[in-house]
UniProtKB/Swiss-Prot annotation:
Protein name: Succinate--CoA ligase [ADP-forming] subunit beta
Residues that bind substrate: N265, G322, I323, V324
Disulfide bonds: none
Organism field: Laribacter hongkongensis (strain HLHK9)
Lineage: Bacteria, Pseudomonadati, Pseudomonadota, Betaproteobacteria, Neisseriales
Family: Belongs to the succinate/malate CoA ligase beta subunit family.
Amino acid sequence: MNLHEYQAKELLAKYGLPVQQGILASNADEAAAAFDQLGGKFAVVKAQVHAGGRGKAGGVKVVKSREEAADVAATLIGKNLVTYQTDANGQPVNSVLVCEDMYPVERELYLGAVVDRSTRRVTFMASTEGGVEIEEVAHNTPEKILKVTVDPLVGLLPFQAREVAFALGLKDKQVNEFVKLMTGAYRAFVENDFALFEINPLAVRANGALACVDAKVGIDSNALYRLPAVAALRDKSQENERELKASEFDLNYVALEGNIGCMVNGAGLAMATMDIIKLKGGQPANFLDVGGGATKERVVEAFKLILADPSVKGVLINIFGGIVRCDMIAEAIIAAVKEVNVTVPVVVRLEGNNAELGARLLEESGLKLTSAQGLNDAAEKIVAAVGA
């Protein structure tokens, strides 16, 4: 689950991080009032969406008056912002953050942290190249990224934070300030089950003070059950409608941009199914794992989810019966096709537990369902059916 910038800053401020002052506004009048309240000659109006690249997309504007703040807010709020991290529809802007102007600054740094799957530990990343996408730095000048792995038994130690501060060229009081900042960030990361944390840029102001100008936080969704206060920050308007619906039925669904809907049991098999569709010249419209213990109801809902996507021109169902029985899946497919009134080609491949019985049920249903013998055959048939 992602947080908005204003939510991330409010959370990090509780752990002592020096964040840029800002006021949330949900309309033009509130934006104008926020400009007055900040009391500066300039302010920065930032669209609040769950996506990076806002500046290049016109979602971050410097304003010089309350009228200009109101105009920018009116332009952004109620619209969708399209960035390189969104799809063609973009993300809805429901509010803007009116922030104090902190520029010019002496330098822009980067500080971030993730859970490194290879070490299974929190790993901090820091760089002198702040203000740009860290992916660009990693690609062009990877030597400029410093990594620090934290031992979970002892936590982040002061000497580790000091080493990072020195590597970033910080001096005197800045070192102690950075140690407090990084230590607070680690506490926030662990106590709130972060999956991702970024301060970009971490500004060194003209007076030498550090300030978090932007903040990005992603929460591990599996931990939300024990984080009620954080879970309450969820903004469902920023999530894909079908993905949101899928979560209600414990379906693992990710929307893609192709035209072949996929329903598979098991994440590994789902990825293999998408791979072979691509290999045969098709484009998957989604990743959908109904799980090893799929029920009839979940399969019906999965079918509805797939067909709710107007770009879907055909559906490939690939089921390996282990825990789940293929005849039960077949019954669910038949019920779903009848209930949803499917008009696109549907190719079904069943293997494993009661596969023959399942295939017979599909054949005797009288519905226009195409059976496939093997994954290769299934992919070829669905790609041919949609004319990919």
